[in-house]
Amino acid sequence: MATLEQNLQEMLQGSVEDLGCELWGIECQRAGRFMTVRLFIDKEGGVSVDDCADVSRQVSAILDVEDPITDKYNLEVSSPGLDRPLFTLSQYERFIGEDITIHLRIPVSDRRKWQGKLEKIENDTVTLTVDGQPQVFVFGNIQKANIIPKF
């Protein structure tokens, strides 16, 4: 069964691309009876406020017609930012060699949070170098991942 994020990604991807942007990912966060639907968009040269406004208008119109969300919600559209979240294995592949933080659904070695250098993606696994040692994680066990920005 597909998640709400997966359904929204499928529903909205084409419209966002028609506006010249890439739908980088979607997060849905529930707080009581309300939900925040956060769309991350990206494009060559960066995302402007106008890009976010255009995507927000287009997506709002689609969600009003399709009505896939039963709860009250707020729609947010933004760039992925410096601490870019990673949603797909292909996104992980684009950032091999970068430092990332991952949060796991099920702990590995009694830890849910790991930080290290992204080394490789292979057979639905993500390998990080943590304290000089390779650590392999099943992609399906990664709840959240973010790039660690370099300053």
Curated annotation (Swiss-Prot):
Compartmental location: Cytoplasm
Cross-referenced Pfam families: DUF150_C, RimP_N
Single GO biological process annotation from the record: translation
Keyword RNA-binding: no
Keyword set, alphabetical order: Cytoplasm, Ribosome biogenesis
Gene Ontology cellular-component annotations: cytosol
Annotated S-S bridges: none
Record Gene3D superfamilies: Ribosome maturation factor RimP, C-terminal domain, RimP-like superfamily, N-terminal
HAMAP family assigned to the protein according to its UniProt record, in alphabetical order: RimP
NCBIfam families, A to Z: PRK00092.1-1
Cited function: Required for maturation of 30S ribosomal subunits.
Protein family membership: Belongs to the RimP family.
Descriptive protein name: Ribosome maturation factor RimP
Organism encoding this protein: Actinobacillus succinogenes (strain ATCC 55618 / DSM 22257 / CCUG 43843 / 130Z)
